[in-house]
C-alpha cells in the first residue's frame, strides 16, 4: 500500500517536510514584512519563491522597528531607504548557496570533495555586488593628500569603497573550537553580548536561539524548498571593511585622519566601462584603495617586496597613476601600510588560506588615547614636529603598521600575548585595553584605550627615519638590507654611527684601494669615490663613481666622473655587498649595557669592535667624540660626531664629514712596510709556504692588485689577530735549527713536472736521507715527502700566530654575567683558538690573551703527557709597544669579477689586527725541523 504522506511528493514533486519557498515561509510567519518589501522592491521575489538555492539571514519586524529608531544611516522609516541601502540590507544577508548553520564553517578539502575540512571557514561571499554601494564623494570629503589634488578642485566623483564584494563574517561553534577561540574571546568580540561558543554570530549579530544548549527553541536552519532561513536578533546593515569601521566611529577620528594619508583614488577603465554598460552612467568610476604592501590588484592579490625598490624599474613598486594628469607617482616603500584595510576580500600571507579561512585585525586607539600619548611618550615627536599632521609619513606608517595584524584567528584576546611588535617582542596589548570591538567583512577592529608604538621609535635606527631629509640614504640601507630587525633588539646595547646624506657622497670604493700616481717623486693615492644620492621621484638610491685624489692629511678631492652604477644584475649585487660591508662597520654592540661609548672612552678604552668584527677607534676631543676607521687611522683623519641621539637600546651618532671606513691595507702590505716584520714575512712567503695568494678558486681576486698585494688564505669572512715575532726571536729559532734558515727555505731552480729539485736533493744527500741503492723514482718520492713536511712545518708556524677574533690594546673587553644578566666582571683574559689544529684531538690549539688599556700578553700552549705531567709549560709573550707596531688594522678583500677597474664586486673581507710580540709562539715541544722530516721519512 502507498502511504498518504507520499501524496505531496506525487502531486508537487517535493516531500512535505521540505516546506514552502523562502518567500512563502516568510509570508506564513507573518512578522517579516520589511524583509518581504525588500525582496519585492529589489525584484528578488521570483528567485526566492521558485528558483535558486539561497541561505537568507532575516530579522523580524520588531528588530527593524528598533533599528529605525537607532541606526547610523539616519533612516527612521522604511520609506526613507534609498535603493543602494535596500540592496545592502538584503544582499549582504543572503548567500547564493543553501547552508545548514552548523556546516557553514566547513570547507571542501582540495583534491577530495567528499572530505570537508571541519571548522576552517569564517567568511563567505554574499549576494551583494560591489556596485550596490557606489558612493558620490564631494570634493570637501576627499582625503587631503597629493593623490587627490587633481580632484579636490573639481566636481564630485563616483567611487567604490572597494572593487571586491564584501563577504559575510561569521563566528560559528565549529570554527571557534577549531581555532581555540574561547567563550571570553567571543564575549569581547561581541562587546559582551555573547555568552557561549555554542552561539552563532553573523556580521556581529546573533542567530536567534543559536546558543540554546537543549536546542528546544531552534529558529535557524528553517528548511525551505529553495534553501534555508536563518533568523537573527538584529538587522544586518552591511559589511563594512576595517577602514570603514575606523571612519564610522567618531572616537577613532584621529586614527582615521592618519589613514587618509594612504588613500588613493584608483581609476580602472575596464571597471568603469562595465559599470556604464550595466547602469547607463557615463561618469568616471573610481575605487578607493589604501597604499599598502599587500592589496587587490584587479585580478588577485599583489604583494610588494622591499627588494623591488632597489631596482631602476618601476616594476614591483607601488605606482599611482593619475588618470587626469597622466602623472605616475612611485609611493615609497616606507609609506605603505602592512595591508590594505579597505580590501573587502583581504587574504593573509598564509598560502594555504583563501578569503574564507581568516581575516585581518587592526588595533586602533581612541582620540583621547592618541592625545595622551602625544603629550606623554610621544612628546619627542611633538617637540620635533609640533603637530601630528607634520610628522613625516614614514614615521606614521611605522606607528600604524605595528597595529595592523595580518591574521585574526591567531591573535584573539586570549592570545594577545602572542601579538608581536616590529622587534618580534610582545606588543603589550591585553584584553583590559579593549574599549570596543567591531566585526568587519575583512577583519576585526579593536578600539583600545592606549597607543601601542613600534620598537623602532625607541631604537638607535629611529633617528635616521625621523630625520629623513638628512639621513634617508642610510635609513633606506638599514631598512632594505635587513639591518632594521637587528637594530630593534631591546636586549642589546648599541652605538650606531649614522652618516648624513652629505657623508654618503664620499664613499671610498675598496676595489680601487692601492691606486696611485707619482709626480716628481711624490706619490698620491687615487682611489675611486662612490657618490650616493636619493632619487625622490623613483624612490631609490642612485650611485655615481668618480676619480679622486687623497692628500697627505687624508683630504679627498673628487675628480672626473666615471659613470653611474645601476640597480640591476651584477651592479645591484655590487651595491648590496658594499652596503652590508659598510653597515657592519657602523654598528657597535656594547658588552656592558650600563656603559656608553663616552663612559668607556673616559675609562681609557679606545677601540670598539663592530658588528662585522672590524675595529673603530674612538677618542674624545674637546668633549666631542671622534671616530676613526682603519682608513682614517692610516690617514690621520678624524670624523667628529656632530649629534648624539640617546635611545632605549643605545645611542646614535650623526657624522657629516665622511663614513668611517675599514683599512685598505692587507696583512701582506702591512708586513712589507715594516722591516721589523721581515723575518715573519719570509716565513710566510717562501718556497715551502703557500699561505699567501692573489687569487682564490680562480674566481676571486685579492684587493690592492695595483700594488701586487696578496691575501692570507687562512682567513675567511671573519675577524682575526696576527702576532708577529721579532726578527731576533725568529733568528734564534733558526739558530737552534727549530726553523729552517732563509737559505734552506730557498729551493732554487726546481721543476714540479720533471721533479728536478737540486736544492732539496743536496739536503737529502747531506743528511743521508736517501737509502743505499735508491733509484731516481725513490729519491723523487723522498724529496716530495721532505717538501710536504717542510710545507706543513712552515704553515703550522704561521697558523699558530693567527687567532680567531680581533684583539687590541685598549679594546673594550667582553663581560661575564650572572644568571640575571648582570655584569660581574670584564673578560680581559680570554682563550682564543689559533688556526693550528691538534691532529690528535681535532681541536684548534688555543692561545691565552690578556689585554688592558695599555698592554697585552699572549701565552702559548701548555703540553702535558698522558699522565697529566707538564712537559712543556706555556710561555707568556708581550706585545711590543715601544716601536708602535701594535694595533695595526688590516682588511683583506676578495673581489669577484675584477676584469676591469670599475666592475669588481666585493665577495668577502677579513678584518685583522697585527701586533709585534717579543717571542715566538710554540704549540708544542721544540723539535728541530730535521727531526720532524726524519720522522716523516721513517728514519730513526
Tell me the role of every PLM-derived stretch.
Residues 3-940:
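Mature, structured domains of secreted/extracytosolic soluble proteins
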Amino acid at each position: 500500500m502507498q502511504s498518504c504522506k507520499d501524496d505531496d511528493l506525487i502531486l508537487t514533486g517535493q516531500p512535505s517536510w521540505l516546506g514552502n519557498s523562502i518567500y512563502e515561509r516568510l509570508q506564513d510567519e507573518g512578522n517579516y514584512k520589511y524583509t518581504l518589501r525588500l525582496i519585492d522592491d529589489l525584484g528578488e521575489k521570483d528567485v526566492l519563491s521558485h528558483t535558486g538555492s539561497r541561505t537568507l539571514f532575516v530579522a523580524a519586524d520588531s528588530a527593524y522597528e528598533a533599528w529605525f529608531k537607532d541606526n547610523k544611516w539616519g533612516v527612521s522609516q522604511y520609506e526613507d531607504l534609498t535603493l543602494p541601502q535596500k540592496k545592502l540590507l538584503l544582499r549582504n544577508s543572503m548567500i547564493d548557496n543553501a547552508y545548514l548553520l552548523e556546516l557553514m564553517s566547513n570547507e571542501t578539502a582540495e583534491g577530495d570533495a567528499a572530505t570537508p575540512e571541519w571548522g576552517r571557514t569564517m567568511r563567505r561571499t554574499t549576494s551583494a555586488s560591489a556596485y550596490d554601494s557606489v558612493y558620490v564623494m564631494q570634493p570637501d570629503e576627499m582625503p587631503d593628500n597629493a593623490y587627490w589634488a587633481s580632484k579636490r578642485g573639481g566636481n564630485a566623483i563616483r567611487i567604490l569603497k572597494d572593487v571586491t564584494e564584501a563577504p559575510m563574517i561569521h563566528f560559528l561553534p565549529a570554527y571557534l573550537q577549531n581555532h581555540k577561540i574561547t567563550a571570553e574571546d567571543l564575549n569581547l568580540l561581541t562587546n559582551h553580548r555573547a555568552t557561549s561558543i555554542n552561539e552563532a554570530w553573523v556580521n556581529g549579530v546573533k542567530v536567534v536561539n543559536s546558543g540554546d544548549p537543549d536546542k528546544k527553541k531552534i529558529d535557524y536552519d528553517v528548511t525551505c524548498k529553495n534553501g534555508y532561513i536563518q533568523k537573527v536578533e538584529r538587522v544586518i546593515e552591511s559589511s563594512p571593511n576595517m577602514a570603514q569601521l575606523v571612519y564610522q566611529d567618531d572616537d577613532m577620528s584621529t586614527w582615521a585622519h592618519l589613514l587618509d594619508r594612504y588613500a588613493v583614488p584608483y581609476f580602472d577603465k575596464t571597471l568603469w566601462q562595465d559599470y556604464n554598460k550595466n547602469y547607463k552612467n557615463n561618469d568616471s568610476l573610481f575605487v578607493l584603495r589604501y597604499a599598502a604592501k599587500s592589496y587587490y590588484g584587479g585580478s588577485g592579490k599583489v604583494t610588494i617586496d622591499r627588494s623591488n625598490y632597489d631596482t631602476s624599474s618601476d616594476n614591483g613598486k607601488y605606482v599611482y597613476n593619475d588618470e587626469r594628469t597622466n602623472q605616475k607617482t612611485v609611493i615609497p616603500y616606507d609609506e605603505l601600510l602592512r595591508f590594505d584595510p579597505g580590501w573587502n576580500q583581504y587574504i593573509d600571507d598564509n598560502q594555504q588560506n583563501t578569503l574564507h579561512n581568516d581575516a585581518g585585525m587592526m588595533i586602533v586607539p581612541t582620540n583621547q588615547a592618541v592625545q595622551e600619548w602625544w603629550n606623554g611618550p610621544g612628546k619627542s615627536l611633538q617637540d620635533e614636529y609640533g603637530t601630528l599632521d607634520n610628522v613625516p609619513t614614514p614615521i606614521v606608517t611605522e606607528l600604524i603598521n605595528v597595529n595592523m595584524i595580518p591574521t585574526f584567528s591567531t591573535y584573539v584576546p586570549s592570545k594577545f600575548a602572542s601579538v608581536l611588535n616590529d622587534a618580534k617582542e610582545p606588543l603589550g596589548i591585553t584584553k583590559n585595553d579593549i574599549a570596543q570591538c567591531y566585526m568587519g567583512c575583512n577583519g576585526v577592529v579593536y578600539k583600545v584605550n592606549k597607543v601601542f608604538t613600534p620598537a623602532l621609535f625607541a631604537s638607535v635606527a629611529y633617528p635616521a627615519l625621523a630625520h629623513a631629509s638628512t639621513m634617508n640614504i642610510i635609513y633606506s640601507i638599514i631598512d632594505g638590507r635587513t639591518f632594521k630587525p637587528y637594530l630593534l633588539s631591546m636586549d642589546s646595547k648599541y652605538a650606531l654611527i649614522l652618516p648624513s646624506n652629505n657623508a654618503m657622497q664620499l664613499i671610498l670604493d675598496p676595489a680601487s684601494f692601492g691606486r696611485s700616481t707619482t709626480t716628481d717623486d711624490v706619490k698620491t693615492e687615487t682611489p675611486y669615490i662612490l657618490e650616493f644620492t636619493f632619487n625622490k621621484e623613483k624612490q631609490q638610491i642612485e650611485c655615481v663613481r668618480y676619480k679622486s685624489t687623497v692628500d697627505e692629511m687624508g683630504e679627498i678631492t673628487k675628480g672626473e666622473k666615471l659613470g653611474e652604477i645601476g640597480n640591476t644584475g651584477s651592479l645591484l649585487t655590487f651595491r648590496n655587498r658594499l652596503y652590508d660591508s659598510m653597515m657592519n662597520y657602523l654598528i657597535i654592540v656594547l658588552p656592558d649595557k650600563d656603559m656608553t661609548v663616552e663612559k668607556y672612552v673616559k675609562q681609557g678604552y679606545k677601540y670598539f669592535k663592530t658588528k662585522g668584527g672590524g675595529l673603530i677607534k674612538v677618542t674624545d676631543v674637546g668633549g666631542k667624540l671622534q671616530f676613526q676607521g682603519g682608513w682614517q687611522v692610516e690617514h690621520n683623519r678624524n670624523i667628529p660626531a656632530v649629534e648624539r641621539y640617546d635611545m632605549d637600546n643605545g645611542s646614535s651618532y650623526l657624522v657629516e664629514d665622511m663614513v668611517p671606513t675599514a683599512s685598505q691595507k692587507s696583512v701582506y702590505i702591512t708586513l712589507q712596510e715594516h722591516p721589523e716584520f721581515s723575518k715573519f714575512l719570509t716565513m710566510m712567503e717562501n718556497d715551502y709556504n703557500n699561505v699567501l695568494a692573489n687569487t682564490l678558486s680562480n674566481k676571486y681576486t685579492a684587493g690592492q692588485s695595483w700594488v701586487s698585494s696578496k691575501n692570507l688564505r687562512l682567513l675567511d669572512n671573519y675577524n682575526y689577530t696576527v702576532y708577529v715575532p721579532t726578527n731576533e726571536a725568529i733568528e734564534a729559532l733558526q739558530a737552534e735549527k727549530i726553523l729552517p734558515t732563509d737559505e734552506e727555505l730557498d729551493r732554487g731552480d726546481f721543476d714540479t713536472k720533471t721533479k728536478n729539485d737540486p736544492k732539496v736533493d743536496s739536503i737529502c744527500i747531506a743528511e743521508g736521507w736517501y737509502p743505499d741503492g735508491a733509484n731516481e723514482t725513490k729519491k723523487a718520492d723522498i724529496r716530495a715527502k721532505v717538501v710536504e713536511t717542510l710545507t706543513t712545518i712552515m704553515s703550522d708556524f704561521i697558523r699558530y700566530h693567527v687567532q680567531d677574533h680581533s684583539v687590541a690594546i685598549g679594546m673594550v673587553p667582553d663581560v661575564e654575567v650572572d644568571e640575571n644578566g648582570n655584569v660581574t666582571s670584564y673578560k680581559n683574559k680570554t682563550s682564543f683558538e689559533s688556526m693550528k689544529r691538534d691532529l690528535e684531538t681535532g681541536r684548534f690549539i688555543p692561545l691565552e690573551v690578556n689585554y688592558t688599556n695599555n698592554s697585552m700578553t699572549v701565552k702559548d700552549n701548555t703540553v702535558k703527557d698522558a699522565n697529566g705531567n707538564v712537559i712543556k709549560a706555556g710561555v707568556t709573550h708581550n706585545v711590543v709597544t715601544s716601536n708602535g707596531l701594535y694595533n695595526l688594522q688590516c682588511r683583506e678583500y676578495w673581489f669577484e669579477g675584477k676584469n676591469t677597474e670599475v666592475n669588481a664586486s666585493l665577495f668577502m673581507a677579513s678584518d685583522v689586527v697585527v701586533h709585534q710580540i717579543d717571542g715566538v709562539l710554540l704549540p708544542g715541544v721544540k723539535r728541530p725541523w730535521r727531526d720532524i722530516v726524519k720522522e716523516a721519512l721513517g728514519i730513526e
